[in-house]
């Protein structure tokens, strides 16, 4: 179990490499949307691509586990904490690049930047095409790894290429080189997304803003965004909606410990204050079991689990 505030030999070793901000025994709950879970043995923010590669090389040589913490949305940290290295890429680690022509444009942003940054840069250059990503929490790196999206589109619809760091260096992969599917992508083993290039087009920015404003308004009305939250909890099964199935199973508003199935949207969990990762994971498991019993559907969690669960 990782103890908060305790500096281990690993944290000291990483500090000796230089080029990184290292926090030993750092509580991770404040860095996740659900505000639950334990601490990181070593939370590391690399200050350069070279420092990131050096970290990955150290981890490979010494058999140290590496976890990636993006924006903390849909991420559940175990109450026992996260051993090894927990990497968090700063949003400004890489410069933004805009290559905009008369009819189209390519935007390259760092993977540690929030998804909303893409939306803002897109609008600044009078580009359209990624409206469906507006309002999705998390980082661009997380959007790549989860192929984030809504009913109106998915990230890989507008991704042209991704840059990935491994212990052997940094290189670009085209979209064709990254297998992806609904809420999933397959990156090289041990790889960390560092930059993302988006292919967009010139268009009606007024209409684009209207679409995004409508989507954001709908989210605010139907999702528990004013509370520490976790969602969507499950991917939608083919031809149905996870929230409908959970509500049909009688679990909307159901609580386990201090975690509750949202009364606004049954495919979300909220932290009522003081919830543990055990509470949240127990509720996820219960939702899955009840829906299977009620409707015969084996729902797939849209959850990234990090660390040790007690």
From Swiss-Prot:
Keywords: Cell cycle, Cell division, Cell shape, Cell wall biogenesis/degradation, Cytoplasm, FAD, Flavoprotein, NADP, Oxidoreductase, Peptidoglycan synthesis. Its main location: cytoplasm. Pathway: Cell wall biogenesis; peptidoglycan biosynthesis. The active site is at residues 183, 232, 302. It catalyses: UDP-N-acetyl-alpha-D-muramate + NADP(+) = UDP-N-acetyl-3-O-(1-carboxyvinyl)-alpha-D-glucosamine + NADPH + H(+). One of its GO terms (molecular function) is UDP-N-acetylmuramate dehydrogenase activity. One of its GO terms (cellular component) is cytosol. Its EC number is 1.3.1.98. It comes from the Bacteria. The keyword NADP applies. GO terms for biological process: cell division; cell wall organization; peptidoglycan biosynthetic process; regulation of cell shape. Residues 35-203 form the FAD-binding PCMH-type domain. It is found in: Cytoplasm. The keyword Flavoprotein applies. Its cofactor is FAD. Signal peptide: none annotated. HAMAP family: MurB. Cell wall formation. Belongs to the MurB family. This is UDP-N-acetylenolpyruvoylglucosamine reductase. It comes from Myxococcus xanthus (strain DK1622).
